[in-house]
Structure formats: structure tokens, C-alpha cells
């Protein structure tokens, strides 16, 4: 005999699931847009405000080693702001030299990465489809190992009795080992080796998106290959060049491990200064001021990159 199931078992979904579905229908787009902003607030704005607060404090023999900005005393709120940390950066030429050398090293390293990365990206983009993925894997593969291990490997290659000097001695190019390790040259080599994949990938992405009918049209109109490259291909891959340059330049400015292990006493980059102020001198307020100024310097290329991206979207949109 057929029996009817209780009506309670076939009732429509309700409760939390119904509320969640209604929330997605009404505010789904707003929630999707809000997620990146929440990410930026938690991982960028909030740490920035904490560092900025410390930069306005004074050094103290305490844990943490700085004074509080706001204190309650006799029922009143006392606010003490110390701008002396920022003034100290202008008085001591060490900080100015560190900023200048960091920007110089980052700029030259970025240019070297571009000189190496563009031909490499071109070779990968114009390789056979069967070997393209293998070449991309070879570009990315070093990034899968520890960054510190890769830097130590550079030390083994660049030292006086390392692989490079032994190879040059075997060829008879040099009579005695070259002093490369613990010099500025070693810093450049280490940064270029570490960050060249970040230059290759954006340029490769731009190259495979090129409409090569434009290149063929330029050649048909009598343009030479070199002129076609600089007047057609380079402008079409400008977005990849700028993106790769930002991915190399920004982290290279604050690099610490490579100058510390490969550089010498003359390699005074801002990352090493930050380390000394935080851990050796335990002067967190001054170190925070150094970090704030470095961040403000990096905002300039970031804003320029953002402006270029908006312009590119407007031209293609």
C-alpha cells in the first residue's frame, strides 16, 4: 500500500541556507569586490599603521623597546608624538647613502634582468609547443627551492676557489682567482639570478598575446627587422616589460639576504640598515621610520605602474 511521506520531509530549504542564498543574490557582487579590500586592509594598511605608530614613539629599555603614544595620567589622555626619528634620517648621511645605493642597485639589476629576460622570454614564446612547457618549467624550477639555499649556492660559485674561478683558471683566461664574492658585483649577480624569472614570465605572457599580423604588415611595408622590433614588438609588450620591472625593482630595493651574504662592507643597502636598527641596536622607532620612508619611495613607481595600467585598459577598452 502506498503511503504519503510526511510534508515536513519535503519542505523548502530555510534557515541559514536560505539566508545565505538571499545574501548572495542581493550583495554577491559587493562581497566579491570587498574581499580584495579586506585583504589589503589586513595585510597592508594595518601593518603600515602599526609601523607608523612605532616610528612616532621613542626608544625605551622595555619590551617592546619603545614608548607608548597614548597614556592615561590623572584621568587625562596624554599623547606624545616624536618626529625626531625622521629628523635623524636627515642628519645622518648613512641613511641617505643606503637609500641611494638601494635604488641604484635595484635599478641596475632591473635593467640587467630586462636584458637577460627579454631574449629568454622571446626564445620560450617562439619555441615549439611541445618544448615550451619544458622551457617554462626550467625558468620557474629554481624558485621551487629555498631562497637562502640558492644564495649559498652563489657563494660556492663566486668564491676564490669556487666553480667560476676554477673554470677560468682551467681555460687560462686568468692567472689568479678573481675577487668577486663580498663585492658589489656579487650583489648584482645574486639579485639578477634570483629575480630574472619574475621578468621573464610577464614578458612571455605579453609576447604570446601579440597579433603577429602587425609584424608581418610592418615587414611587408619595408621596415627592417630591427626597426620592426623596436617600433612594433616592444610597444606591444610594454605592459609585460613594466610589470616585470616592478616585480624586480620593488623587492630588490629592500633586499637583505643577498647583500648580507654576497656583499661586502661597502654594500650598504636599506635592508641591512633595517636589520641593524631592529636587531643590533634595538631601535625600533628609527627602524620603523626607515621603513616608512622606503615605502613612500616605492609608492612612486607603484603609482606610475597603476597609471600606465589604467591607460592601457582605456586604450584597449
Descriptions of predicted regions:
Residues 11-54, 58, 133, 137-138:
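N-terminal signal-anchor/first transmembrane alpha helix
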Amino acid at each position: 500500500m502506498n503511503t504519503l511521506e510526511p510534508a515536513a520531509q519535503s519542505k523548502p530549504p530555510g534557515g541559514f541556507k536560505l539566508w545565505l542564498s538571499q545574501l548572495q543574490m542581493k550583495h554577491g557582487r559587493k562581497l566579491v569586490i570587498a574581499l580584495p579590500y579586506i585583504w589589503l586592509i589586513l595585510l597592508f594598511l594595518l601593518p603600515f599603521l602599526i609601523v607608523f605608530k612605532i616610528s612616532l614613539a621613542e626608544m625605551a629599555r622595555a619590551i617592546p623597546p619603545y614608548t607608548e603614544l597614548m597614556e592615561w595620567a590623572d584621568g587625562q589622555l596624554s599623547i606624545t608624538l616624536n618626529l625626531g626619528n625622521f629628523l635623524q634620517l636627515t642628519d645622518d648621511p648613512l641613511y641617505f647613502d643606503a637609500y641611494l645605493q638601494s635604488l641604484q642597485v635595484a635599478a641596475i639589476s632591473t635593467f640587467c634582468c630586462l636584458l637577460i629576460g627579454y631574449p629568454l622570454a622571446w626564445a620560450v614564446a617562439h619555441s615549439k609547443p611541445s618544448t615550451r612547457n619544458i622551457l617554462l618549467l626550467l625558468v620557474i624550477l629554481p624558485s621551487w627551492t629555498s631562497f637562502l639555499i640558492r644564495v649559498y649556492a652563489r657563494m660556492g660559485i663566486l668564491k676564490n676557489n669556487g666553480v667560476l674561478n676554477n673554470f677560468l683558471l682551467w681555460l687560462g683566461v686568468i692567472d689568479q682567482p678573481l675577487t668577486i664574492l663580498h663585492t658589489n658585483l656579487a650583489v648584482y649577480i645574486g639579485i639578477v639570478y634570483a629575480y630574472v624569472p619574475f621578468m621573464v614570465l610577464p614578458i612571455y605572457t605579453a609576447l604570446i598575446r601579440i597579433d603577429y599580423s602587425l609584424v608581418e604588415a610592418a615587414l611587408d611595408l619595408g621596415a627592417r627587422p630591427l626597426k620592426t622590433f623596436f617600433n612594433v614588438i616592444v610597444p606591444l609588450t610594454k605592459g609585460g616589460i613594466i610589470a616585470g620591472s616592478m616585480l624586480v625593482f620593488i623587492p630588490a630595493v629592500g633586499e637583505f639576504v643577498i647583500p648580507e651574504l654576497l656583499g661586502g662592507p661597502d654594500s650598504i643597502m636599506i635592508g641591512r640598515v633595517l636589520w641593524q636598527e631592529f636587531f643590533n641596536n634595538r631601535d625600533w622607532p628609527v627602524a620603523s621610520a626607515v621603513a616608512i620612508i622606503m615605502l613612500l619611495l616605492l609608492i612612486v613607481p607603484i603609482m606610475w605602474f597603476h597609471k600606465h595600467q589604467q591607460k592601457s585598459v582605456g586604450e584597449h577598452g
